[in-house]
Amino acid sequence: MSRSKMLVEIEASLDDTSLKYKIGPSAEWLQYIHKSKFNLAPRGFGRTSYRLAEIVQIGRIPVYMYDDFPWLPYAGTEIDLSNFGFSGQMGSLRKVVTEMNTISPEKFQKMIQSLAVVRKHYTYSGVINQIEMFIRDPLGLDGGHLRCCRVPDKEH
């Protein structure tokens, strides 16, 4: 799904909510991320979203959108995105928007606290540390939070 189609879907999904979206000039992206409760991190030219790591490092709640397969770091571990953000397949954005719109203040604060814990894993040094642990003990308890999975067949 193209980003322009995704924006149309976002606009339609927000109709019945108190949520709003803003597309800011690229020079002001950091300012807008800091002001936003939730930040969209659509997959990029590759399978994942570089913006996801940027949003986590800044300490805001990411909303990762994918088109065919969720390609997320640390999936299935205690530092999985589900503990501090949202994800959904493009085309089903309304479900994600409903989750965001109905989040309790307590759940939101818990997600922010989880972000503070996982932030280091989304920095360059944190990723290098995870790779080193995985190489030293790929199947053991000290192997870090990286997981291997088969690359999906769809080419991107």
Write out the residue ranges for each language-model feature.
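Catalytic binding pocket for nucleotide-activated donors in carbohydrate/polymer assembly enzymes
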Residues: E28-Y122, R136-P138
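Conserved catalytic-core segment of nucleotide-activated headgroup transferases in glycan assembly
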Residues: M1-P25
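C-terminal alpha-helical cap of glycosyltransferases
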Residues: Y124-H156
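Low-complexity, compositionally biased segments
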Residues: S18-L19, P70-W71, N83-F86, G140, ...
